[in-house]
Design a protein with these regions (language model features):
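Amphipathic alpha-helical coiled-coil segments
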Residues: 66, 73, 120, 166-169, ...
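Extended amphipathic alpha-helical interaction segments
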Residues: 85, 89-197
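Leu/Val/Ala/Ile-rich N-terminal alpha-helices, chiefly Sec-type signal peptides and the beginnings
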Residues: 3, 7-107
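Alpha-helical oligomerization segments
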Residues: 182-221
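Generic alpha-helical secondary structure signal
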Residues: 18, 110, 117, 216-217
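A broad, low-amplitude sensor of folded, mature protein cores
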Residues: 1-14, 18, 152, 167, ...
Length: 221
């Protein structure tokens, strides 16, 4: 096991109970270190007991919180629907006045999510989680167990991978928002070549229509 030696090094195996709990915590920690935390489900079931369960729960909840940040950025990506954004109902006098505010909102939200993620993979934040946990007897021992797992090189690599996934998802979002802004600019600059009829954008110039759908395809690709 990846962590078994390290965990034993900070343990005091004075009873069968402690050995069993440490083995289980090690097993669960190794699973988290080896799995794809972004694309695979994090098993939040707590298999240990007493103070060990607090350590296990803190580890799993911490990783889940980071993953949830990634999922929030992905949700923003999925909510960019060009057909809705540039629907006839949003067109007014050849302009789409609500687009700029949507772009700014999504940029700001995604920036905040990325900043949260970067903060969570810092050592101070990682340790704050266990220091705030309701550990009672032999707190230093259980904090050391948590520290051995969460500050290990293997877990640091996992955290960096998660942060990279959040950053990549945000970059993808920014690219989409740039295209949305470009479509808005294109439609407004060529407003004389389209109008609204029966809740649809109707183009009067074939070349402009083709260019518009090319931009839409770029957004959806």
């Amino acid at each position: 096991s990846i962590l078994i030696v390290a965990l034993i090094a900070v343990s005091f195996l004075y009873s069968k109970f402690n050995k069993t709990q440490l083995d289980t915590l090690t097993e669960e920690s190794n699973k988290l270190i080896q799995q794809d935390l972004i694309n695979e489900e994090i098993n939040e079931e707590i298999r240990t007991q007493k103070e060990y369960a607090i350590v296990e729960k803190t580890i799993k909840e911490y990783l889940t919180n980071i993953k949830n940040i990634y999922l929030e950025v992905e949700k923003l990506n999925s909510q960019i629907n060009a057909e809705e954004i540039f629907s006839a109902s949003n067109a007014e006098d050849g302009k789409f006045n609500n687009v700029d505010s949507l772009v700014d909102e999504y940029k700001e939200k995604s920036k905040e999510y990325l900043e949260q993620c970067i903060s969570l993979i810092e050592e101070d934040s990682i340790m704050e989680a266990i220091n705030n946990a309701e550990l009672t007897a032999k707190k230093d021992y259980y904090v050391d167990l948590y520290k051995t797992v969460m500050l290990s090189d293997s877990m640091k690599n996992q955290l960096l991978k998660m942060e990279e996934s959040v950053e990549k998802s945000r970059d993808n979002l920014i690219d989409k928002l740039t295209i949305v802004s470009n479509i808005k600019k294109f439609l407004e600059e060529n407003s004389r070549y389209w109008n609204v009829k029966d809740d649809q954008l109707i183009f009067t110039n074939t070349n402009i229509m083709v260019q518009y759908y090319e931009l839409l395809n770029e957004l959806n690709s």
